[in-house]
Amino acid sequence: MTQKKLLVSNSEITRCIFGSFDKHARRLEEAFGVRIFNRADENGAGDCIVIEGEDGAASRAHDALSYMKKAASLGDELSDQSVDYVIRMISDGAQNELAELDDDCFFVTARGKPVKAKTVGQKKYVDAINKNTIVISTGPAGTGKTYLAVAMAVKALRKDNPKNTHFKNWW
């Protein structure tokens, strides 16, 4: 049985990580077969999230919680869907790809909300838009294709770089 700790300096971030009624923590416990609980830091510097479980499981849960801490500290909302995505990526051994997602805020809305790829597939799509003149994308509805394409187009227009942004009047 291994015990790992994650220090969190802000209790609001801890609340975001654990989720309402600790649902995110319970989801992580079920997925990785660990026990997660929160204690006050011994030095009084915030909270200490403690993970207990087998070596590999505790490490995976620690990686997931570290990513969630980083996302929460950047102001991202940790939804049930995003927590499930983190669990799936960590379980598949894709920690490095997951870590790259938060590094790419490519646009900020008028209300100050950062626009960035939330999945590895979206990151590949944004990279393809940046590298290619034309990108044709297909996929299930609701996966962010149009949202990201419009955000990238507005970004190009704001940079006074409309030469790579073509809008065709279809009517």
Predicted regions located by residue number:
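Short glycine-/aliphatic-rich beta-strand segments at the starts of folded cytosolic domains
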Residues: M1-C16
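Interdomain "pre-motor" coupling segment immediately N-terminal to P-loop NTPase/helicase cores
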Residues: V34-D102
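Pre-Walker A adenine-sensing motif
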Residues: P114-N130
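Conserved glycine(s) of the Walker
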Residues: G144
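Hydrophobic positions on the alpha1 helix immediately C-terminal to the Walker A/P-loop
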Residues: L148, M152
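Post-Walker A helix-loop "phosphate-sensing" segment adjacent to the P-loop in P-loop NTPases
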Residues: K155-T165
